[in-house]
Amino acid sequence: MPRRREVPKRDILPDPKFGNVDVAKFVNVLMLSGKKSVAENIIYGAFEHIQTKSGKDPLEVFTAAILNCKPLVEVKSRRVGGANYQVPVEVRPVRRMALSMRWLREAANKRSEKSMPQRLAGELLEAAESRGGAMKKRDEVHRMAEANKAFSHFRF
């Protein structure tokens, strides 16, 4: 157990355009080398693409995409008697959010569209409809947890 006091979580300020904390978090996930304005431009560009492509509210698409990509369970390695077991564990809410955002970013990076705003818009639209690379990743993690259900008694 740590002897020091627990460090409080910092509050993230909502993003300037939409006033949404989740969008601000996603800006931070997307940001490279501290270039926040570039990350903001990518996200706002993606939101414009979503608006023109589908005619839906970009914030609703964004929240639906994140909600759909959140994993419920994942596997963690646990060493028991000289053997490593993949033990399924429930994912904490903060980590759920972080994983879904990370998977959306990685899936958007792997897409073939020309610019990052277009790739991100495509991935968000697909994830909102429960398909796409990020959803594939979530389903893969769920499958791993399901396959290793027998080891769930090795709790952490």
From Swiss-Prot:
The lineage of its organism: Bacteria, Pseudomonadati, Pseudomonadota, Betaproteobacteria, Burkholderiales. CDD domains: uS7_Bacteria (cd14869). Belongs to the universal ribosomal protein uS7 family. HAMAP family: Ribosomal_uS7_B. GO terms for biological process: translation. The gene is rpsG. This is Small ribosomal subunit protein uS7. InterPro entries: Ribosomal_uS7, Ribosomal_uS7_bac/org-type, Ribosomal_uS7_CS, Ribosomal_uS7_dom, Ribosomal_uS7_dom_sf. Keywords: Ribonucleoprotein, Ribosomal protein, RNA-binding, rRNA-binding, tRNA-binding. Part of the 30S ribosomal subunit. Contacts proteins S9 and S11. One of its GO terms (molecular function) is rRNA binding. It comes from Herminiimonas arsenicoxydans. GO terms for cellular component: small ribosomal subunit. One of the primary rRNA binding proteins, it binds directly to 16S rRNA where it nucleates assembly of the head domain of the 30S subunit. Is located at the subunit interface close to the decoding center, probably blocks exit of the E-site tRNA. The keyword ATP-binding does not apply. Pfam families: Ribosomal_S7. The keyword Ribonucleoprotein applies.
